[in-house]
Amino acid sequence: MLSTFAVRWRTTKTTKPQNEDALDHSGAHGVEPSGSTVVFTDITEAPLEPLYAAAKAEVMTDAMGALVIFDGIVRNHDHGSAVRGLSYSAHPQAREYIAEVAAEVAAELDGVRLWAVHRVGPIAIGESALTVMAAAAHRGRAFDACELVADRVKARVPIWKEQELLDGSIEWVGVDTSPA
């Protein structure tokens, strides 16, 4: 049996204000934002989950129509081995590197707002290790920005993972352990 759907069409009209110079182009008056902002970056020992609501409030503006969040969660396995727990260690300049990565992405992609924090120290299975938030007027730009920041943090920020495997052995990830 076929159903009949009523469709209500809405007509929109683009209008230009009388005084274009009076507009705030930050996006507060219906204009897409230009320029990008790194809202916050950090390396911390504190759990990331309690930061989410405040981070979202800082990243979002009325001009942002999309928020993409990458939340890297500690899992109980890695490359076929069962993981009991892990700890991250960071180079003393890791904060500078994560800020640099976010600034690069902000320079490459117009109209994004970025927030990125990596946790160090012991982290339990199921907890967040890296959280990236990217807001933009449209989802494609927000997805691109979030992916670029997450990928570059993993590739370039000097942070190393020490995994305690279920069999009692220890495995370092991100550290060259081959003999010199």
Language-model segments: residues:
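N-terminal, polar/charged subdomain of small-to-medium soluble alpha/beta proteins
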Residues: 2, 7-129, 135-147, 151-180
